[in-house]
């Protein structure tokens, strides 16, 4: 698995924590910023990561800002991307199993580092289940195509 990860300055410390976890799990990743003491407008980072995932250069993406909301909204502007804001273990699991979310977003001002690592593990260890959820994901894609 290959992960694209990015954040704004508010998410920098949490991103570093998640990078440590990716290394522990021997998961290949690329850090798309922001970098230490770098101020960025988060939509630019969300766009970079979402495009990398959309173009199949990376299997999944992780985006972190203050709340996770703006990153999710921006990533979902990219045709074909499903980004989910994750702040609890059930949502982390269902984002993958039910919705086949390509990108998880988190809020560094909303959750702490130990919860973030747990959510990352849950999200990484969950796969799309298909079944009844397949029709829902297919309809999401149809709506996305129709409204581009």
From Swiss-Prot:
Q: Recite the UniProt keywords alphabetically.
A: Carbohydrate metabolism, Isomerase
- Record: residues binding D-ribulose 5-phosphate: 8-9, 66-70, 99, 132, 136
Q: Please list the residues that make up the active site.
A: 65
Q: What pathway, per the record?
A: Carbohydrate degradation; pentose phosphate pathway; D-ribose 5-phosphate from D-ribulose 5-phosphate (non-oxidative stage): step 1/1
* Role played: Catalyzes the interconversion of ribulose-5-P and ribose-5-P.
List the protein's name.
Answer: Ribose-5-P isomerase B
Q: Name one GO biological process term.
A: carbohydrate metabolic process
Tell me where on the tree of life, at the top rank, the source sits: Bacteria
Q: What family is this? A: Belongs to the LacAB/RpiB family.
Q: Which InterPro entries match?
A: RpiB, RpiB_LacA_LacB, RpiB_LacA_LacB_sf, SPI_LacAB/RpiB
Induction line:
Repressed by GolR.
Please write the reaction equations for the catalytic activity of this protein: aldehydo-D-ribose 5-phosphate = D-ribulose 5-phosphate
UniProt enzyme class: isomerase
Supply the NCBIfam families for this chain: PRK05571.1 (NF004051), rpiB (TIGR01120), rpiB_lacA_lacB (TIGR00689)
- What EC number(s) does this enzyme carry? 5.3.1.6
A molecular function (GO) held by this record is: ribose-5-phosphate isomerase activity
């Amino acid at each position: 698995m290959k992960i694209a990860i990015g954040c704004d300055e508010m998410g920098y410390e949490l991103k570093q924590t998640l990078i440590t976890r990716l290394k522990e799990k021997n998961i290949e990743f690329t850090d798309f910023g922001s970098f230490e003491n770098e101020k960025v407008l988060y939509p630019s980072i969300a766009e970079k990561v979402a495009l990398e995932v959309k173009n199949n250069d990376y299997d999944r993406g992780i985006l972190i800002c203050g709340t996770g909301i703006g990153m999710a909204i921006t990533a979902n502007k990219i045709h074909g991307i499903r980004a989910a804001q994750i702040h609890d273990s059930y949502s982390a699991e269902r984002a993958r199993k039910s919705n086949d979310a390509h990108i998880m977003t988190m809020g560094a001002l909303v959750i702490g580092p130990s919860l973030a690592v747990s959510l990352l593990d849950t999200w990484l260890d969950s796969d799309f289940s298909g079944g009844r959820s397949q029709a829902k994901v297919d309809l999401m894609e149809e709506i996305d195509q129709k409204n581009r």
